[in-house]
Amino acid sequence: MTTKIERRVKIKYRVRNKISGTAERPRMSVFRSNKQIYVQIIDDLSGKTLAAASSLGMAEKVAKKEQAAKVGEMIAKKAQEAGITTVVFDRNGYLYHGRVKEVADAARNGGLKF
């Protein structure tokens, strides 16, 4: 029997084999810890992070879903500053639910297409 983390890692690698970020359409990767959420926009061909945002520097205490929505808005803003309009969404093995969904919805509302 596999644990939740082992299951997530299996899904993560299976999906990673199918999607890849390019300079024109980079990969937007989400990592979720118990307290924080991190988002990176990555060009896999050159191995470079083009933009990143996280909930680490937030001063005010808010609910985790609200925190995720703010991070989604931040990454959309940083992506537009870097000239990125479309991305491939990589949920990193997490279910498309809760905080991961909030990040995606906020990024879409901020102007990113995926």
UniProtKB/Swiss-Prot annotation:
Belongs to the universal ribosomal protein uL18 family. Keywords: Ribonucleoprotein, Ribosomal protein, RNA-binding, rRNA-binding. GO terms for cellular component: cytosolic large ribosomal subunit. Part of the 50S ribosomal subunit; part of the 5S rRNA/L5/L18/L25 subcomplex. Contacts the 5S and 23S rRNAs. Pfam families: Ribosomal_L18p. This is Large ribosomal subunit protein uL18. HAMAP family: Ribosomal_uL18_B. GO terms for molecular function: 5S rRNA binding; structural constituent of ribosome. This is one of the proteins that bind and probably mediate the attachment of the 5S RNA into the large ribosomal subunit, where it forms part of the central protuberance. CDD domains: Ribosomal_L18_L5e. InterPro entries: Ribosomal_uL18_bac-type, Ribosomal_uL18_bac/euk. The keyword Lipoprotein does not apply. One of its GO terms (biological process) is translation. It comes from the Bacteria. The lineage of its organism: Bacteria, Pseudomonadati, Bacteroidota, Bacteroidia, Bacteroidales.
